[in-house]
């Protein structure tokens, strides 16, 4: 590595970064020996790790700590687009002291919130907006991400029917969030479809970080897990910007920026909150 990069490696200080480790799952096993040897610091990253690394030969328990990366939340987004830290601190102070936010700051933050609903928190989409200040370019980037998701779904299983079910479930998320019954209805895909038969397909979408399931509970008493009803749930996209992109056939981005009232903001706002809580 040192010869290739022409950079000297310093014991205990050099960080060696392995990216896209899902393409070589054995790295997860080998890293144990590398850590034991002790010369360098190692970081591993990749995509779809929740599903791609389930069958690795030996999990290096005790040799690594795991960090989950999520799409940017609203605070991270406004920092990325250039809002000074002192402005964010002023908003936080008003919140904690229960005092009104300066009117000008309030107006600008609301405009940025509308922008966040459109751009979302996917790093590539945010960077595209920063570089171009063009929503159409952002939508193109988001569509590319969604298309990559669909390609990953196509790799899921040899069973073509399972691939089609997952693809259809993913496409149905936007309309299901608008449904009056407030939960995902499997029969909209197929009259004979049951959660028990296809639970693993929903779990795959969750483990692949493409969707966020939120389960109903019989009563709002802690711990919620004890009264969880796994067959009654809502399914959110993993990013509000991707959700807006899936809604984009009606020109929702422009309507949101213009503050139009003929937009169903309920599902979009609900999704934004779900995404923030998950992160």
Label each PLM-derived region with a short phrase.
Residues 127, 131-279:
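Accessory nucleic acid-recognition modules appended to NTPase machines
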Residues 1-8:
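Conserved NTP-binding/hydrolysis module of P-loop NTPases
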Residues 36-57:
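Sensor-1/coupling segment of RecA-like P-loop NTPase cores
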Residues 8-27:
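Conserved P-loop NTPase "ATPase switch" module shared by AAA+ and STAND
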Residues 29-33:
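A short acidic, amphipathic alpha-helical/loop segment
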Residues 53-178:
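Interdomain motor-coupling "hinge/lid" segment immediately C-terminal to the ATP-binding subdomain
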Residues 17-19, 41-47, 68, 77:
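Structural recognition of the conserved hydrophobic beta-strand(s) that form the central parallel beta-sheet
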